């Protein structure tokens, strides 16, 4: 087996993680750009849509622990499986809407109506559910 220099190994690993992060951001950008085009959303430039995608991703990562905590709190109630799934979906949709709304408020060069914010949240909820249904 060939031994690598630790700095080269670290560089290769860093490049892999950077490429993976870029793929995630570009996927978010593509989905949001397509949604904005279909919904007729007004925005100043594609760079603002990219900024929206990055802020949406970061805020989503910040809000996710609170979303998971709220969903986990439903286990303390004696609810049926269907009601639990419904409540979890509602909480996920509301947190995604809160992320889209907060991102819209932070970026002044994109003008989203509340309906468009809910469409963004619903699309990302559907994508999340489709992704979680795939085998690992």
UniProtKB/Swiss-Prot annotation:
Induction: Expression activated by ComK. Positively regulated by SigO and its coactivator RsoA. InterPro entries: YrvL. Keywords: Cell membrane, Membrane, Repressor, Transmembrane, Transmembrane helix. Disruption phenotype: Cells lacking this gene exhibit a slight increase in OxdC accumulation under acidic growth conditions and a huge increase under nonstress growth conditions. GO terms for cellular component: plasma membrane. Its main location: membrane. It is found in: Cell membrane. It is a multi-pass membrane protein. The chain crosses the membrane at residues 18-38, 46-66, 83-103, 106-126. Negatively regulates RNA polymerase sigma factor SigO-dependent transcription. Prevents the expression or secretion of OxdC under nonstress conditions. May act as an anti-sigma factor. This is Membrane-bound negative regulator YvrL. The gene is yvrL.
């Amino acid at each position: 087996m060939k031994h690598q220099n630790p700095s080269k190994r670290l560089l290769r690993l860093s490049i892999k993680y950077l490429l993976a992060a870029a793929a995630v951001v570009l996927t978010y950008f593509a989905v949001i750009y397509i949604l904005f085009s279909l919904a007729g959303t007004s925005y100043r430039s594609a760079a603002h849509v990219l900024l929206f995608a990055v802020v949406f991703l970061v805020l989503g990562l910040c809000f996710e622990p609170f979303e998971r905590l709220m969903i986990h709190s439903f286990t303390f109630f004696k609810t049926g499986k269907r009601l639990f799934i419904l409540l979890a979906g509602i909480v996920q949709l509301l947190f995604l809407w809160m992320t889209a709304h907060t991102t819209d408020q932070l970026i002044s060069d994109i003008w989203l109506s509340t309906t468009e914010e809910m469409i963004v949240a619903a699309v990302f909820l559907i994508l999340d559910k489709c992704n979680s249904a795939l085998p690992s």
